Amino acid sequence: MEERGWEQLDFVYISGDAYVDHPSFGHAIITRLLETHGFKVGIIAQPDWKDKNSITILGEPRLGFLVSAGNMDSMVNHYSVSKKHRRTDAYTPGGVMGKRPDYAAVVYSNLIRQVYKKTPIILGGIEASLRRLAHYDYWSDKLKRSILLDSGADLISYGMGEHSIIEIAEALDSGIAVSDITFIAGTVYKTKSLDSVYDAEILPGYEDMKQDKLEYARSFYTQYCNTDPFAGKRLVEPYNDHLYVVQNPPALPLSEGEMDDVYGLPYMRTYHPSYEKDGGVPAISEVKFSLISNRGCFGGCSFCALTFHQGRIMQVRSHESLLDEAKMITQEKDFKGYIHDVGGPTANFRQPSCEKQLTRGVCKNRQCLFPKPCPNLKVDHRDYIKLLKELRDIPKVKKVFIRSGIRFDYVVADKSDAFLEELCRYHVSGQLKVAPEHVSDDVLTLMGKPENSVYQEFVKKYNKMNQKIHKDQYLVPYLMSSHPGSRMKDAVELAEHIRDLGYMPEQVQDFYPTPSTISTCMYYTGVDPRTMQPVYVPKNPHEKAMQRALIQYRDPKNYDLVMEALKKAHRMDLVGFDKHCLIRPRKFEGRSQQKVPGQKTQNQKFSGKPGRNDRGKNKNEHSRRNTVQSDRQNSRQNTGTDRSRQKKKSIRNVHKKK
C-alpha cells in the first residue's frame, strides 16, 4: 500500500486459500477484475481465525470485505467421505493441513463482525454459493440455514461472480447502502419485509423443512428448476421472526469476449513468493500448464453441483485467447513441452447444446443428454478439433493432453469419428480416463447418467479406433460406490463388471453428499426430488464399506467385507475357484489367511500356537498338537505332487457340493 501510495483500500479480500495469482483461483479473478475497474484491493490469505487482529492488518476497507472459503468447500477440503481428517491441503503452502477453519466463510465473517460492526461483508466462492439457501450439511447431519444468516454477512455473490461483483462494487461506490442492494442478478440478500420483492416464488419455510424432509425435497427441486438466468425466478425462503432470504435470478453467462477479458488479465500465474520457503502451493502444479477453455456443463449429473454454480449454459473462450495463453505458457522456464489440459468441467463441450440456449435459456424440465440425447442437441466437435490442432502447432509444444473429462455419450452421439480419432491419435498418453460411474441402469438413472449400453458402445468405438491407428491404449473408468439407489445387488453387478475387465481400480469414489446436488437431496430425504419417489439410500458405514470393497475385491484387505457382502446379496455362487468367482473360500488348515475381526483364523485354530485365551491350557496338549502338525508336514512332503493335486481337486469338489 505504501509503495502504491494508497492510504485506504476499497476492498479487502479474505481467502481460505493461499494467494495464487492464477485464473484457476477465484480470488485471483475477482481481485484482478476489480483492479481493472479502478478499485483498490488487498488480499489477506488464510488469516489466523483465532486472532481477530489478523483481519485488521490492511485496515478497514472503504467499501467492504469480500470473503471466500477458497476454491473448495472448507469441509470437503478438511474431511474425507468417512469424515476423517485429510492429511494435506493442496491450497496451503507446503500442503500443510489446518490453516483454515471448518465452515471458513462463516468463521471469517463472524471474525470481521467482532471488529467492524457496520462494514459491508459480501460472501463469494463455492462454499457460499452452494449454501446460499437452506441446505443439508453432511458433516453435522443437519439441515442448516442459509449461510447468509449464520455468517452475519450482508450479501452473497453466487456463481462465478464476475458480473455481480462489479455491479455490487459500483453500487457501493455510488453511495448506495448495502441493505438497499437488492436488485443485482446473481446475489442473495436478507430482508424483514417483502413489500419491495416482486415476481417471487415462495419456498417452504426453514422450520417446515426441518420438520418434514419432503418439504425440503420440494424446495430443492424448485431451486434446481430456477438456475437458468433467462427463465429463473426470484426465490424467497421464509424464516422465523418475519425474516426472509431472497435469491435473485442468476447472472447472465459471460460472452466469448468477456471470457477472453477475464482470462487475459495480468496474472502472475504462480503463488506469492513469500510461500517459496515453505515449498510453494501444491495446487499450482495441476493448473500451471493447463488451459481453461470453457465453463458450464449441460451434462446434468445428479451428484454434481455445477448446475447450481456455473450453470448449464456453455461459456467459451476464443481460439485467439487460448493460443495467446498457450504461447505465454511455453515461455515459462520450467515448461517441458507438455500442455496438461485444454478443457473445463467437460473438455469436449465447446458450444451451446442447442440454438435456443443463448437467447431463451435451458429447458426447465428436461436434460440435454439424459435419458437420451435431446432431438435438438447439436453434437459437433469441429471447433474443438481445430483448437487442438492449432495448439499442437505452437513452437515448443510437444504434446497436448486432455485431462478434464470427456463426455463419452456426447462422443457416441457424434455421427463423425473425427474427434475420437484426433483424441486417440494425439491427446491420449496410454490411458484415457472416463466416468461411467456405474453399470447398473437403476443406479445410473438416479445419477442422471446414460445407460450402461452407451458406455459399452463407446468402449467398442474407442478400442476399434486404437486398432485402426495401431496404438495400444486403455480406458480407466471412474467408478462410484454407495450412491443413492445402489443396493448390494447393484454393487455386486459392478464388481462382476470389473472382474470381466480384468483389473482392479486403484481409486474408488464413495458417494460424498456435498451441498446443493440432487444426489445429496436424495441422501437426506430418501426421495428423488424430481419425481418424489422413494429411493434406497445406503447410509450405514459398514454397508458403504462393503459396497466400496466389492469394487476392489482383489485387495486381500477387503476379503472379509467382500465375503459378507456376497452373503447379504445371496451371491455365494461368486465364492469359489471358477473363473467367474470374485473370491475363493477360506483356505484350509496350515495355510495363511486373513483374520475376521473378532474371530480366530484357521491358522489360529489349528496351528498349536497359544493365543491369549490359550494361556493355562495343558502344556502336554499343546505339545501333542505340535507333534501332530509336524507329522502332517512330514507326511505331506513324502506324498509328492500327485497327492497335492488330488487334495486340490477334493477341495474344489467340497466347495461345489456346498
Mark where each language-model region is:
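Glycine-rich beta-alpha loop elements in corrinoid/cobalamin-binding modules
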Residues: 26, 45-240, 247
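Conserved, mostly hydrophobic/aromatic
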Residues: 154, 262, 297, 322, ...
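C-terminal accessory regions of radical SAM enzymes
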Residues: 172, 180-255, 489, 504-505, ...
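Flexible glycine/acidic-rich beta-alpha junction loops that bind and position SAM and/or redox cofactors
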Residues: 73-82, 130-132, 162-167, 192-195, ...
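Intrinsically disordered, Lys/Arg-rich low-complexity segments
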Residues: 591-658
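N-terminal pre-triad scaffold of radical SAM enzymes
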Residues: 14-17, 278-305, 330, 338
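Terminal amphipathic helices with adjacent charged low-complexity linkers/tails
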Residues: 50, 179-230, 242, 251, ...
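Conserved SAM/AdoMet-binding glycine-rich loop
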Residues: 13-16, 29, 44, 48-49, ...
